Amino acid sequence: PFTVANFVTLAEGKNNYVSPNYKGIHYYDGLTFHRVESNPPMIQGGDPTATGQGGPGYKFKDEFHPELNHGKAGILSMANSGPNTNGSQFFITTDQTSYLDGKHSVFGEVVDGIDIASTVVVGDKINKVKIVRIGQAAKKFDAVKVFKEYFEKQAELQKVLEGVKAKKVALFQDIKTNGTKSKSGLIYKITKPGTGKKPNAGQNVFVHYAGFLEDGTLFDTSYASVAEENGVLDLARKQANGYAPFPFSYGKKTGLIAGFIEGLENMKFGDKAMLIIPGYLGYGEQGTGPIPPNA
């Protein structure tokens, strides 16, 4: 419902979370379709800058439902730049695009005029978006209230997440103080011993992991539960069974960062360990993705 509330409040000029220059205006009126594609087949609009980079001044999370999919032409769905980065940009499919399921939030459908959508070209203008409420459920739907409640809930969740991060930081400090420091500078601690047997060199093992920055920010994990606890669960990845341990040839010296490999070499089957990996044993000065330089 909050995805619909987003669109409705923007269209009616009642969205209280937009940047000041968009306050009180009918956001979509006069904007253009800045992107028209054949693969994926769709027309995209909702960007006041017409560059594909613009938005309302906020982002909100994905909202999926198994009955809402991209299985045909005329589906209205949110454009994004990755998980939980929805704003104001939307697209309308001009053919089935089922491979977008679990990646983009469906919130509407063209019931009349899909033939017009197929003739749209880049630069065509959206003259006006008018919200017409048909039926009691639609008339009772308070878009302003629904969107407000979404952000209030997100604020509460953020407080919880800050608490989770604070506990992680305290745990990391404890490991730094009480863990074992190797000659390389890696600090590690076996937090839960396993079977006591060490893998043979070349033996294939499966490794679960959760990677955090020093401030407690989770940057990646093989555990869906850890991702959810830290507020970064990727539903598409979960649906694709992407949260799983990865295979690794024990004793191999390549394929992972040096600190991770060294940590694994200090572990046995079933062990759980905490590793404090200095930047020079990680991604170094260049960093990578969400991991900054020297982290």
Task: Please provide the spans of the model-predicted regions.
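Cross-family detector of peptidyl-prolyl cis-trans isomerase
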Residues: 1-295
